[in-house]
Amino acid sequence: MSEPKPIQIFSNTNVNIGVNVIKSPVKLTILEMLRDRDMEFDEIVSNTGKSKSTVSVHLKSLRESGIISYKVHPVDNRKKIFYINSKYIGSVDGSDNTQIQETQADYLVKNIVDEDAEFSTLLFHTLKAMLIQEGINIDPILQSTGNSIGKSIFNKLYDDDLDVFMNNLAEFWQRKGLGRLTFNIGQIIKITTYDCFECELLPKTGKPACFLDTGIFEGLFTEFFNLPVKVIETQCYTMGDEKCVFEVEPLGIKS
């Protein structure tokens, strides 16, 4: 028997729609696929392994909820291409409630008193650790928040020389107590952070955790290149690494 999927939460700015909580396993499977890319009806049927009638019912329900929509295929107007029409804001997984060290009192005392960790940073880490323990995933919100922060601080760091801009960013990062940042510029910009403010004290989960950082870099470099960029965290303290590494890749000209 397969494990239950985490409940997913979507929001839509339309006042008549608001927030939708999705629990249906079939709907969750469909939405996971559509978060990766737009898909035709037959593709969705094939990938879910469900009957056409079952998929059709779920797609109709998701459309009526304002979570997805569709467009007519540009070549064959008999076909529909489905896409997500709302914002994915997080998920809740109640299947694992194991207590983790980072939320226990002795761990907090050790880092506040014995190690003299930055209190505001420890508060942030404790909150994130508690969310992880309770199975609450707000990574999309953190990334969106980071994106807004990156765009708001861009003008303070900007220089038309990329090397100077990166040095300004590294100085800002250290001055604000966010960690130590180094970089390597190529077709893909590689950013390495040490003593990461976002994740250094978080539990080892085997997955990257720096979605606020990812969003900040996304916002900064989208503004710098005036292009959409893809930012991927390839190494992280929560993956057992001794640093966090981000790869920034400009994608294409804005339409």
Residue spans of the language-model regions?
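C-terminal non-catalytic interaction appendages of large macromolecular assemblies
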Residues: 209-255
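Short capping segments at the starts of secondary-structure elements
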Residues: 25, 36-40
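Pre-recognition alpha-helix immediately N-terminal to the DNA-recognition helix
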Residues: 28-32
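Short helix-coil-helix linker/hinge
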Residues: 20-27
